Amino acid sequence: FNTLRQAILKGELKPGERLLEIALAERLGVSRTPVREAMRKLEQEGLVVMIPRRGAQVASITEKDLNDVLEVRIALENVAIEKACKLITEEELGRLWVAAKEFEKTKAEGNLVRLAETDVAFHEIIYQASDNKRLNQVLNNLREQMYRYRVEYLKEEQTRNLLVNEHEELVKAIRDGNVERAQEISFNHLENQRKAIIRTIRVENEAKEDKKKE
């Protein structure tokens, strides 16, 4: 499961690429059963889609899909941040600082998949601090639907440096109970991400069109 997941996140398996059980089983040196189970898990994460009579393929995302997801996510992030500003404990605030520093440390290592995971871990603490399990679940589901593109988003050094600053500013705003400032930082964070991912989607679409013309 993790091997296939990492291959999708790193872009080794491209959006729209068919995932053949037999070929993957041979490639990984396993039977078809664990491959089939991995497909189901990846489908739940939004990384794989099952097409009738065609089988599994790496999920693609359109600009409309992305905008729909982010429209809902921005609204729910605002709720989570408002609640976190009011309810966050000293222990959670401490973990948030540690997570922000861990992101900065991982940035220096250059592992983009690991960097995306540390970014997720940072935001997960904020969701937990909101003390609403259902809200946490929905936000995690929305985040997973665009997870693959986060690695593309993190490829630019300028973006990585910006995120380090945004994380630190967000921790300070939540610590101070400054809801408006925290929500502003979160919105800018997601809007920058949206623009970067749309650039990636357009490049992918252009590549598909060029391939059709060949």
Where in this protein do the model-derived segments appear?
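Hydrophobic, well-structured mid-protein blocks that either form specific transmembrane helices
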Residues: 79, 85-103
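C-terminal all-alpha effector/ligand-binding and dimerization domain
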Residues: 97-104, 109, 148-214
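Hydrophobic residues in alpha-helical segments
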Residues: 8, 84, 107, 130, ...
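Hydrophobic, amphipathic alpha-helical faces that serve as interaction scaffolds
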Residues: 72-88, 118-158, 193-197
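Short linear motifs at protein or domain termini
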Residues: 1-82, 86, 124, 198-214
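A general structural signal for well-ordered alpha-helical segments in protein cores
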Residues: 1, 21, 66-69, 73, ...
